[in-house]
Amino acid sequence: MSETQNTQVAKRQRTLVGKVVSNKMDKTVVVLVERRVKHPIFGKIIMRSAKYKAHDESNQYNEGDTVEIAEGRPISRSKAWRVVRLVEAARVI
């Protein structure tokens, strides 16, 4: 084996799936991600939610769309996620 051989292990990228709740900002969407957690004392399954600002380069996602977001380098002070793909479009009534 060579001592000069550099082996880099690719970090697995964090991805989440959530619903777009706001697209009022330019090139940014707010995604609500909900997860189910078991309560530590009572044992009941409860919903926990978090909002993430994600980068939307072409302003193509609307409120109600279900999207997949991936973590990356910081794009701005509060935005380090980007939209990867559209999972399900919002139903238009």
Curated annotation (Swiss-Prot):
* PROSITE patterns on file: RIBOSOMAL_S17
The free-text function statement in the UniProt record for this protein reads: One of the primary rRNA binding proteins, it binds specifically to the 5'-end of 16S ribosomal RNA.
Q: Which organism is it from?
A: Bordetella pertussis (strain Tohama I / ATCC BAA-589 / NCTC 13251)
Give a yes or no for keyword Nuclease in this entry: no
**Top-rank taxon, per record:** Bacteria
Q: Quote the HAMAP family the UniProt record gives.
A: Ribosomal_uS17_B
Q: Spell out the Pfam families in the cross-references.
A: Ribosomal_S17 (PF00366)
According to its UniProt entry, the protein's GO biological process terms are: translation
List GO molecular-function terms, semicolon-separated. rRNA binding; structural constituent of ribosome
Q: What is this protein called?
A: Small ribosomal subunit protein uS17
- What InterPro entries does the entry give? NA-bd_OB-fold, Ribosomal_uS17, Ribosomal_uS17_bact/chlr, Ribosomal_uS17_CS
Q: Which GO terms describe its cellular component?
A: cytosolic small ribosomal subunit
